[in-house]
């Protein structure tokens, strides 16, 4: 039976009990021994105004929810779940995913980003670091082919946003994967994407949630 539960940190601001239950169900699937709430997540939940949010999910496991922005500097953002799992985005490109099983420790995606943010096709190399079961870092290299799939409208909080859809097919010695990006035409930013985190959970769905203001 598939699990369809939400780890919605934003709901913690409104209904703590409900959010706790949902957080626990997701955490049980991914991190059975994790604490009920991570102290950093509790701190974020008390901030006003509410920090920026992402809709996220793992289609392969039918899991979905929301992450809150913890830090941002020079286009590099750190996002956090209730139980302390975190991702890093560099101008919308996923560079790390920690706390989700065997996810990426870090990555170099500069060549891919240079093409994708400009809506251009071409070939790029990227490098991912993974922590294996022996607590050793493994470096994986990939050659990626980026294709422009044309114009597509994305709804952000019900509002249509004109984007260019791009697909990135990456090939390495040990694994292959496909990332998909929707880049806002007017701002050259990734507003929605499916990006690979590793073999355990596969692709992560990531979507911006516009500010309420």
Predicted regions and their residues:
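Poly-acidic low-complexity segments
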Residues: 1-2, 42
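Sec-dependent signal peptide recognition
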Residues: 2-9
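C-terminal motif of bacterial Sec signal peptides marking the signal peptidase cleavage site
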Residues: 12-15
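Acidic, serine/threonine-rich low-complexity disordered tracts
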Residues: 17-88, 92-98, 121-213
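N-terminal trafficking/processing presequences and adjacent post-cleavage segments
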Residues: 103-132
């Amino acid at each position: 039976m598939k699990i369809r539960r939400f780890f919605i940190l934003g709901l913690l601001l409104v209904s703590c009990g409900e959010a706790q239950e949902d957080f626990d169900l997701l955490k049980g699937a991914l991190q059975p021994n994790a604490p009920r709430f991570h102290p950093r997540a509790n701190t974020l939940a008390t901030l006003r105004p509410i920090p920026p949010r992402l809709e996220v999910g793992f289609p392969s496991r039918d899991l979905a929810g929301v992450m809150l922005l913890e830090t941002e500097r020079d286009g590099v953002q750190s996002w956090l779940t209730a139980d302390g799992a975190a991702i890093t985005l560099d101008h919308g490109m996923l560079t790390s995913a920690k706390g989700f099983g065997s996810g990426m420790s870090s990555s170099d995606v500069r060549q891919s980003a240079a093409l994708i943010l400009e809506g251009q096709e071409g070939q790029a190399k990227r490098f991912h670091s993974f922590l294996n079961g022996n607590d050793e870092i493994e470096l994986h290299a990939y050659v990626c082919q980026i294709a422009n799939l044309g114009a597509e409208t994305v709804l952000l909080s019900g509002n249509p946003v004109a984007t260019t859809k791009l697909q990135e097919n990456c090939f390495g010695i040990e694994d292959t994967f496909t990332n998909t990006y929707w880049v806002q035409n007017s701002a050259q930013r990734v507003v929605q994407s499916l990006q690979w985190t590793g073999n355990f959970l596969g692709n992560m769905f990531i979507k911006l949630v516009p500010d309420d203001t």
